[in-house]
Amino acid sequence: MGGAMLAGWLAAEVPASFTVVDPVATEVPAAVRLLREVPAERFDVVLLGVKPQALNDAASALAPVMTEQALLLSLLAGAELASLAARFPVNGGIVRVMPNLAAAVGKSPIGLYAADLSEAARAAVTELLAPLGSLEWLAGEDQLDAVTALVGSGPAFVYRFIEALAAGGAALGLDPAQAQRLALSMVEGAASLAATANQPPADLARRVTSPGGTTAAGLVVLDQEAALARLVADTLRAARDRGAELAAAVRG
């Protein structure tokens, strides 16, 4: 996720210098400094993108090099503000951030939550993240597990749906590669229309549907016993619950 955000910042030509600390990365863009270990320098903004299980080690290495007014942006699913504050004694603020891979192209929805963040820090975070997509500040930290499921994990679910559409098209006789191109282009176009139309998706679906037509026949299958709605709800719930499990593990 951090790599996608970095790509988005570089594409937007954000006026900042970037240092990536990664013991296994082999290459980064030319404008980025890659280090194997945390340097003996001071940083004003730290983006934390490790696995939750590595939080303690990351904190031991990073906390000493953060300036007194540094901002910590955490991508860690399940790592709550209290857990982060106990490991990173910073005054600038701690913000939990949940984007997705579309940050690389400036199209990610981004859920954010912080407590006791100054107006100046909030403005700085907004300015930094705005090039990556659309920002949604959340009213409560308890909403982040749901945002992680919907926004962070959501692209994988959409990709699976595109894969299923392509496979279904191939099963109807289309060339598999052609079916995949058609499915991808269809989803891209439908999403673009939904994003620009001043109508809810349900209304757009009705616009496509003629009584007794082909679309109506397909929707009968999708809507039978609310099959699609139940499947999606169960999928998001499973991802949400896993986030809660990760939070419990971080709390110890």
Predicted regions and their residues:
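Hydrophobic/small residue at the entry helix of a nucleotide-binding pocket
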Residues: 1-2
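Rossmann-like NAD(P)(H) cofactor-binding subdomain of soluble oxidoreductases
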Residues: 5-7, 21, 26-28, 35-112
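Short pre-catalytic strand/loop immediately N-terminal to key active-site residues, enriched for Gly-Thr
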Residues: 95, 143-149, 201-206
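Internal alpha-helical scaffold of NAD(P)-dependent oxidoreductase catalytic cores
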Residues: 83-93, 109-146, 158-196, 242
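NAD(P)-dependent Rossmann-like dehydrogenase/reductase catalytic/cofactor-binding core
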Residues: 184-252
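A short, Lys/Arg-enriched amphipathic alpha-helix followed by its capping loop at the start of a domain
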Residues: 8-15
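Short beta-strand element of Class I
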Residues: 17-19
